Amino acid sequence: MSNTVEFARMNGLGNKILVVDMRGRKDVVTAAAAIALNADPATEFDQIMAIHDPKAEGTDAWIDILNSDGTKAQACGNGTRCVVQALAAETGKKVFTFQTVAGILNAVEHEDGTISVDMGRPVFDWDKIPLAEEFADTRRIELQIGPIDNPVLHSPSVMSMGNPHAIFWVDKDPMSYDLARFGPLLENHPMFPERANITLAQVLSPTLLRTRTWERGAGLTLACGSAACSAAVSAARTGRTGRKVTIDVASAPASGQLTIEWRENDDHVVMTGPAEWEWSGVVDPVTGSFTRAQEQGAQAR
């Protein structure tokens, strides 16, 4: 078996994704390889999407997801769109079904190049998110950062979109908050035994939200698809918006928007947005050493 596999550097709204082709192999991308790849500026990433042979009948692939710190992730909406684009370019297919540790994901590439991913149903039960304390209503829980009488952030909505999320509603631009300071404290708060993704969300109109996310296991990120889904669901649950909104991802590149619909007929959350290929190469999934394909020569690391 060759020591190297093909991989591509891609992004979903700037969310840095490495798509690694592990089909036909029995091994996995190791935590050591993930940490090594993230340490190199050329391959620094938010998530690795490792494509494996399907485990279940009727699925196109098993997707193993790793964070930049080497830990496993249960879901990555932006990364899933990147996988769809890569496989659509390879196979000519437009409709895909993937299996992850969080369950089944269905996705479709549209004629305009955007990609929709059915992220499944949100989970609101406190013990399934999970939380360390019991809350009958997870639309708003008791948690704050800052002085008791004047907290900077407080009373988040919490849920799981395959991974734990806390949504803090704010009245000003999410970029104006020091999320690099508060993010690690909240991600690792005792309330979240499996840690959590932390999102600041602002209502700009009844159909438009603005968000910024500290991603569990990755830190500040340009975009997070499951966080955008969680913000949209929280907005609808708390009466701030209807069930279909546009998400303006504050930290994403220009025109960084996602459309999120929390369908009423089945409670599934469908995310639609772009994916972009940047470059490709080969990588050792055990060590993380890679060679980047270039028009003139190649660069080995």
Swiss-Prot record:
What metabolic or biological pathway is this protein involved in? Amino-acid biosynthesis; L-lysine biosynthesis via DAP pathway; DL-2,6-diaminopimelate from LL-2,6-diaminopimelate: step 1/1
Name where it's found.
Cytoplasm
| GO function terms (MF aspect) | diaminopimelate epimerase activity
The alphabetized UniProt keywords are:
Amino-acid biosynthesis, Cytoplasm, Isomerase, Lysine biosynthesis
Residues at which substrate binds: N15, Q47, N67, G77, N78, N163, N197, E215, R216, G225, S226
Record-level GO BP terms: lysine biosynthetic process via diaminopimelate
Q: Which GO terms describe its cellular component?
A: cytosol
Function of the protein? Catalyzes the stereoinversion of LL-2,6-diaminopimelate (L,L-DAP) to meso-diaminopimelate (meso-DAP), a precursor of L-lysine and an essential component of the bacterial peptidoglycan.
Q: What is this protein called?
A: Diaminopimelate epimerase
Give the originating organism.
Rhizobium rhizogenes (strain K84 / ATCC BAA-868) (Agrobacterium radiobacter)
Write the lineage as a comma-separated list: Bacteria, Pseudomonadati, Pseudomonadota, Alphaproteobacteria, Hyphomicrobiales
GN (gene name): dapF
